[in-house]
């Protein structure tokens, strides 16, 4: 399962682990409790980012605090030079879920409605129609618990789904823990990430309405790659605004998007009023997802044959990703286990929602005491340091106002390697769940993530 660090440039594995320990020293071998752990955090081998390893201190059978896991040299001291012994849990194609799960149906407090950027009144479907196909608008506001996956979408999912789950037995031994560690691996998709889970249905619904072109943004290139792949399947033209710092630092992502027929621009660009306004203020702007969103939205809003597509944040996007967790539930049942903790990286919410929401259904309706922890970068800590309020989803202020934890739509994060996590706000659903104390959030430094990724590799 583990790919060669020097050669695999796009494969992405979602993994992380939590170590319950009695001591400050993360190599402690005495434990008060051994919860089963299921995780879905990110690691790109050869270009790796988003891997979050945490140490949890237990006192009096309580999870007292979460601190970064720093002591990796103990692996050498214990002469544990293997990390590959794992147990694979698979599903048949016939077990691909037939419906997406909409957590809105089970939330005790529904998110506040999005507001029109001009009137600041609740926005209606007519105002969203220039940007999205009607079926996605319906999904965005729906409170129906189960939304059927179209047969054509499900058939395309079968190109790579169901994705495998692994029990990281070698990692457990390396840590000296009796906790069970599982991870769901989404890197088997053609684009190398979880993003095609929503790119495919978004392209499908646009194609059904006769849309000829989709404009979008991308950070590190994962979403742009996924949508390029999906648009190619449905004969739709794809135009991608890629955050400049990633455009320059990750040229292979641009090549991948071009291979699937997409046109890719560095953002901010001189192609839009939004881009030009940013460059006038800062000709050397590294760009941000908020800026790239502004440019893509402008293209969609000014061209009748073009719609806009977003790879995270919005309700329908998060719902499409729940296919990950729905499969994981079946795989955990096959393994005879159930997770106590779920961990996932957090940029706008799609990865986290995908693995966590189906298990949170058990918490909201079935009394399961599962914990879901969103892990974000310290350079863009919207969940841990942001303010809950209405804010724009883009930098210029063209999108509807969304109720979210936000650092402010003008916030430009540091140009960290994890380009897909450089977003100022969180989706409305995730923000409401955090506000209600149903989920948790922590922030981790980039260097610690790199070190932890090397240990896992």
Language-model features: locations:
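Metallocofactor- and cofactor-centric catalytic cores in central/energy metabolism, strongly enriched
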Residues: 137, 146-182, 189, 201, ...
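Positively charged, low-complexity intrinsically disordered leader regions
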Residues: 86-210
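Alpha-helix C-terminal capping segments
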Residues: 201-211, 225-237, 258-259, 356-366
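Active-site/ligand-binding loops adjacent to catalytic centers
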Residues: 146-148, 278-280, 285-316, 324, ...
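Active-site nucleophile and cofactor-binding loops and adjacent substrate-binding regions
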Residues: 185-198, 214-224, 314-317, 343-348, ...
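Active-site-proximal loop->helix
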Residues: 223-286, 382-392
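A short, small-residue-rich loop immediately preceding and capping a beta-strand
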Residues: 198, 209-245, 338-351, 372
């Amino acid at each position: 399962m583990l790919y060669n660090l020097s050669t695999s440039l796009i494969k992405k594995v979602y993994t992380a682990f939590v170590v319950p320990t009695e001591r400050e020293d993360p190599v402690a071998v005495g434990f008060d409790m051994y919860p089963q752990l299921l995780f879905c955090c990110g690691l790109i081998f050869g270009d790796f980012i988003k891997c979050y390893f945490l140490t949890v201190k237990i006192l009096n059978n309580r999870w007292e605090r979460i601190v970064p896991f720093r002591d990796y040299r103990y692996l050498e001291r214990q002469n544990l030079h293997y990390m590959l012994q794992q147990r694979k849990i698979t599903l048949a194609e016939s077990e691909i879920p037939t419906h997406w799960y909409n957590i809105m149906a089970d939330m005790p407090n529904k998110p506040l409605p999005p507001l029109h950027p001009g009137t600041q009144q609740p926005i209606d479907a007519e105002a969203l129609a220039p940007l999205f196909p009607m079926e996605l608008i319906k999904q965005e506001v729906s409170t129906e618990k189960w939304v059927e996956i179209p047969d054509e979408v499900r058939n395309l999912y079968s190109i790579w789904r169901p994705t495998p789950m692994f029990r990281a037995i070698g990692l457990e031994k390396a840590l000296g823990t009796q906790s069970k560690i599982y991870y769901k691996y989404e890197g088997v998709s053609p684009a190398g990430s979880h993003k095609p889970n929503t790119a495919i249905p978004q392209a499908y619904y646009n194609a059904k309405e006769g849309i000829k072109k989709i404009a979008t943004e991308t950070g590190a290139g994962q979403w742009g790659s996924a949508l390029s792949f999906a648009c190619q399947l449905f004969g739709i033209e794809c135009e991608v605004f890629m955050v400049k710092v990633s455009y320059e630092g990750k040229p292979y992502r641009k090549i991948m998007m071009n291979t699937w027929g997409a046109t890719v621009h560095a953002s901010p660009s001189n192609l839009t009023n939004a881009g030009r306004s940013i460059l006038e203020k800062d000709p050397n702007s590294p760009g941000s997802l908020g800026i790239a969103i502004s440019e893509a939205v402008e293209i969609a809003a000014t061209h009748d044959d073009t719609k806009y597509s977003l790879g995270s944040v919005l309700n329908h996007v998060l719902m499409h990703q729940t296919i990950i967790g729905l499969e994981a539930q079946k795989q955990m049942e096959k393994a005879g286990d159930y997770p106590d903790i779920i961990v996932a990286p957090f940029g706008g919410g799609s990865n986290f929602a995908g693995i966590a929401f189906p298990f949170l259904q058990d918490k909201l309706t079935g009394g399961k005491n599962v914990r879901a922890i969103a892990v974000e970068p310290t350079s863009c800590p919207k969940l841990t340091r942001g303010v809950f309020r209405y804010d724009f989803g883009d930098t210029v202020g063209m999108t509807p106002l969304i109720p979210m934890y936000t650092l402010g739509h003008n916030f430009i994060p540091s140009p960290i390697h994890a380009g897909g996590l450089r977003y100022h706000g969180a989706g409305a659903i995730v923000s409401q769940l955090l506000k209600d104390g149903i989920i948790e959030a922590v922030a981790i430094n980039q260097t610690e993530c790199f070190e932890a990724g090397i240990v896992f590799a």
